[in-house]
Amino acid sequence: IMGFVSGLPLLLTITLLQAWLTDENISKSTIGLFALIGLPYSLKFLWAPLFDRYVISALGRRRGWLLLSQVFLISSIFFLGQSQPEINLYNVAVLSLAVTFFSASQDIVIDAYRRESLKESEQTIGASAYVLGYRFGALAAGAGGLILADIYSYSLVYTIMSLIMILGVITTLLAEEPKVEFKSYTLRESIIEPFKEFFTRYTAINSNIKAVSYTHLTLPTNC
């Protein structure tokens, strides 16, 4: 189920949204710009450390963050469906970005929950089940959403999808919090130091690539 609710939001802001904007006669150049709303999926590493550092509810570290992201995700999907692209495209962009942000956040926590709640021998099966559910979720939002939109309105389709996402909330409430001991990290240890290490490694790798490239270009060739 967690894989399903992870895959479902993805195509709501890609395939289904593009079809909706096209039907509303939004220009192709504007629709192309909407590809930028997918950035949170690529940049989610920026706020992922916060989910390890802070506990926000009695549900526990993982379930607390998961429930919060799911509630905001469902709300974003619902209100996106109530927006009107032909009148206020800005609202559509903001709500679409909210969907991708909270969807990416949900993915972070679900991945951590899966790794911590399964034994080492169960990780492969767990990952396979997650991917299978993810594909079914994407199929439901993509093909299923387009079929429903052809019969009903896009607003109703997004409302239906937001209601389906409640399955994730129910699963979160019924699931058990992983029994994992967490070391308490400072803000510097959990966020600043990883970034510092990342950019240090990136700089070193980049320097090595430049050095190798320079050496390769300046080596004499034998004729």
Label the model's feature ranges.
Residues 33-53:
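Central cavity-lining transmembrane alpha-helices of secondary-active solute carriers
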Residues 128-142:
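Glycine-rich segments within core transmembrane alpha-helices of 12-TM secondary carriers
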Residues 215-221:
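Conserved small/polar residues in nucleotide/adenosyl-binding loops
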Residues 158-173:
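Symmetry-related core transmembrane helices of the 12-TM Major Facilitator Superfamily/SLC fold
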Residues 1-37:
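Helix-loop boundary and gating motifs at the non-cytosolic
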Residues 71-85:
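C-terminal ends and interior cores of transmembrane alpha-helices
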Residues 181-211:
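Juxtamembrane intracellular "pre-TM" segments in multi-pass secondary transporters
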Residues 89-106:
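Hydrophobic core of transmembrane alpha-helices in multi-pass small-molecule transporters
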